[in-house]
Each structure stands twice: as structure tokens, then as C-alpha cells.
Amino acid sequence: FGGYSVYYLAGHHDKRFKCFIAHDGIFNTQQQYYETEEMWFPNWDLGAGPWRKGISADPDNAEKVNDQQKVNPFTTSPHLYVDRWDTPILCIHGEKDYRILSSQGQSAFSAAVMRGIPAELLLYPDENHWVLKPQNGILWQRTFFRWLDRWLKK
């Protein structure tokens, strides 16, 4: 949930952060629900599909939960809070990540650019959710620290 958390925090941080870095994060939970090839995790993590009005926060005891205790995780999707984004963001994603498609990172990057927020997209055509190739790892480290140097030294 690291990348998801970064995208969510970008809309809820009240100027506590000078920049953000999101790696393979979920930007739009509804889009993610439909575009992943792995159907078990979205149902487990989110409780059910976006068509459900209320989802139990405890799937094992769903029948014991009343309507006031139900939540809809799709209402906390980071993309719904882009209007609050105001902080530079670096989005990193691997195009061979079939669980969280690169369109999530590309969408977050595009949202930031359209809002006039400084943003950068580091897209690996040959990596999945993990950066495994040594040369790509070096690029990841250099980009990561260059981004921090740029925004934290101001």
C-alpha cells in the first residue's frame, strides 16, 4: 500500500511534505479493481466490487456488521482528491507490473501535470513491481535521490 498511501497523502497532508515519491502505486481504486488480472486480492483488500454501497471493514464478520459500520473503500480513492494536490510528485512504475498496471502511475503523473504541479514519471519498460535489473536499480537510486535533493534543499 506504499504507492497508494503516497497518492492519498498528496491530497491530505496539509503542507507537511515538500515532495512525494510513489512507486507502483494505485491511483484509482475503481480502475485498479477492473484492470488487474488478479481477482482475489482486490476482493480481499477492498471487500467487494465498486457496485456495493457499503462493505464491511471485517469480511469475516460481514453478517454481524450494521449499515453504519460499513464503509466503501472506493470513496477514498486517491484520484478523488487530486483537486487538493499541490506538492511535487515523482511517479515510478514498471510496465511489466501486471497486478498494478503502469496506467496507474501514468494517470497520477498526468493528473499532477494537468494541475500544474511539478511531476516526473520514471517508467521501466522491462521491470515489474520490483526493479530487479542492476542498471535499472542504479537509475532508480539516482532518480530518487536527485528528486529529494531538488525539493528538500529549497
What feature does the model see in each segment?
Residues 1-154:
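Active-site-proximal cap/loop segments of hydrolase catalytic domains
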